[in-house]
Amino acid sequence: MNVLIAEDEHDIALLYKMALERRNHQVTTTENGENCLKAYHEKCQNRRFAIHDIGQTLPFDVVILDHKMPKINGMQVAEEILAMNPRQRIIFASAYVKETLTDSIRKLKQVVELMQKPFNVNTLIDTVEDKEIYSELKQLDVDLDIIKAINPTHEQIIDLLKRLRTVQKGRTF
């Protein structure tokens, strides 16, 4: 997977980067919201991604944003990215209390994920890698909005996918 990270704390950004790269993900890190947007725009231009082109793949599989950053905060970055690509997957990794961020996230009018710091780096990896699982669930005609509304754990999502695969194998046409 191709991951873009905006995190102003260098040690945390490095931890995320190293952990994800160990899992063979390609990682771009930026230290503030302004540089995150620059990296996102550059990737769009380099790959000639069309803004609002639903048929195109996205420049990054996931964008991980800290909320409070210098220059431009994570919420502003998310707004701009989602205006360009409404299907872009965004994960907020923030020390802010979930309840505080939830109201702001609702204003985005898009589904974004939220991880409250501190968390184990393996939790981040599980969250990032759920994207592949969600893609397979979508291929099985599962309503992802309902699944995300339930807010299942990584293990529950994997269990659901295994069960659906079993059901799918049992179907005969």
What role is predicted for each listed range?
Residues 66:
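Active-site residues of response regulator receiver
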Residues 35, 119-128, 132, 136:
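C-terminal output helix
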